[in-house]
Amino acid sequence: MLDFDAIPRIDIALGGLLPQKRTMLLIDSARGTAGSVVASETTLGSRHELFAQRDGTFGSWILLELMAQTIGIYAGLKNRAEGSGPKVGFILGTRHFDARVPFFRAGDTIRIRGECIAYFESDLPSQFECVAYLGDAEVGRSRLTVYQPKDLTAFTHDS
């Protein structure tokens, strides 16, 4: 069970930590520590319509994006401590993504707990263990390998 309230609240606007535009910023609130744990919360609704299925439910794969944005908050806090702003990161892969429910409904509040297993400030990928909760029930789990390039232009087309 996730004791969400035991994790200190982050009093920084999420737009100051994540590079997504408001239309793609899926998380409502975040919590984190000076250590290796970060957590987020979101209530599913119309702004998550990109992930909606024809019947109005949200496929369990939305958990991967919520986990990725939670990890982005962790990276955003690190970047902010170093004096820089939000940076784009990539999911390189996932191990053992286990969704315990096939879908979610509008109004469901999902909480994500991410723990940094390995964080590299050099040009290496990092790993996070993430767990998703709906109420007290664990509804998903994954280990994500992520990468935040120092120079994003090395991965984009020349202008």
What are these regions (language model features)?
Residues 15, 29, 54, 99-103:
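Beta-strand-rich interaction surfaces with strong enrichment in secreted/lumenal proteins
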Residues 8-14, 111-113:
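Short Pro/Gly-enriched beta-strand edge/turn motifs at strand-loop
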Residues 18-26, 104-111:
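Short coil-to-beta-strand transition motifs
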Residues 22-59:
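Catalytic strand-loop segment that frames the active site of acyl-thioester-processing enzymes
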Residues 1-11, 41:
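Single-stranded RNA-binding regions, centering on S1/OB-family and related RNA-binding modules
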Residues 55-74, 88-92:
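Compact, glycine-rich, soluble single-domain proteins
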Residues 73-113:
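Hydrophobic beta-strand-centered segment that forms part of the acyl-chain substrate-binding groove
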